[in-house]
Amino acid sequence: MSRLLFVFALSICLLPVSAKASAVESLKAFVNKALTFRADFSQTLLDKNFQVVKKASGSMMFERPGKFRWVYDQPYQQLIVGDGKQVWFYDQDLAQVTVHRLDQTLGSTPAALLAGGNTIERDFNLQEIDVQGETEWLEAIPKNQENAFELIRLGFSQTGMLREMILRDSFDQVTWLIFSGTEQNPVLTPDLFQFTPPEGVDVISD
């Protein structure tokens, strides 16, 4: 395991609870003020022993409530689009589109979680975590036991910009997202949150 991943794994287990309220305030401000958002991301999936399973990268954007576009560029091309009612998963290599209702996916993807409305305090138990470097950490534990993730951690800069996101699922796999080139409240055109399946692909729906 690399030194970076070792430090990351240690932080997952040992980050102490802090008395500060800055991360919660940053989250509330982000939810209430970031009506649109855009960023590039790198994503690392780790198994329960914190060994790297896969890495990916791409770009993402959202418009509250419930509209988002999540694009994987590497190592494969995949597109996830939420149009406010449905979520479209397009795997270009498989030539396959899967469609789900938005309310069925709100807790199952990072994109849907970030693009949700201002109900986070209703849906999650929030707990402060100590500052690491220049990043203020917050832990959110879903109140709904059927959520795809058991634990979510959000890292904000001291100016309140989202920097990192960590999600642990029921198999103790960890998804680690690092955001860069972030823009809060950019102008996003409606067509970015619309999707029409390409001709000839298989479409699987609920």
From Swiss-Prot:
<keyword id="KW-0143">Chaperone</keyword>
<dbReference type="InterPro" id="IPR018323">
    <property type="entry name" value="OM_lipoprot_carrier_LolA_Pbac"/>
</dbReference>
<dbReference type="Pfam" id="PF03548">
    <property type="entry name" value="LolA"/>
</dbReference>
<dbReference type="GO" id="GO:0042953">
    <property type="term" value="P:lipoprotein transport"/>
</dbReference>
<protein>
    <recommendedName>
        <fullName>Outer-membrane lipoprotein carrier protein</fullName>
    </recommendedName>
</protein>
<keyword id="KW-0732">Signal</keyword>
<dbReference type="InterPro" id="IPR029046">
    <property type="entry name" value="LolA/LolB/LppX"/>
</dbReference>
<dbReference type="GO" id="GO:0042597">
    <property type="term" value="C:periplasmic space"/>
</dbReference>
<keyword id="KW-0574">Periplasm</keyword>
<comment type="similarity">
    <text>Belongs to the LolA family.</text>
</comment>
<comment type="function">
    <text>Participates in the translocation of lipoproteins from the inner membrane to the outer membrane. Only forms a complex with a lipoprotein if the residue after the N-terminal Cys is not an aspartate (The Asp acts as a targeting signal to indicate that the lipoprotein should stay in the inner membrane).</text>
</comment>
<feature type="signal peptide">
    <location>
        <begin position="1"/>
        <end position="23"/>
    </location>
</feature>
<dbReference type="InterPro" id="IPR004564">
    <property type="entry name" value="OM_lipoprot_carrier_LolA-like"/>
</dbReference>
<keyword id="KW-0653">Protein transport</keyword>
<dbReference type="GO" id="GO:0044874">
    <property type="term" value="P:lipoprotein localization to outer membrane"/>
</dbReference>
<comment type="subunit">
    <text>Monomer.</text>
</comment>
<keyword id="KW-0813">Transport</keyword>
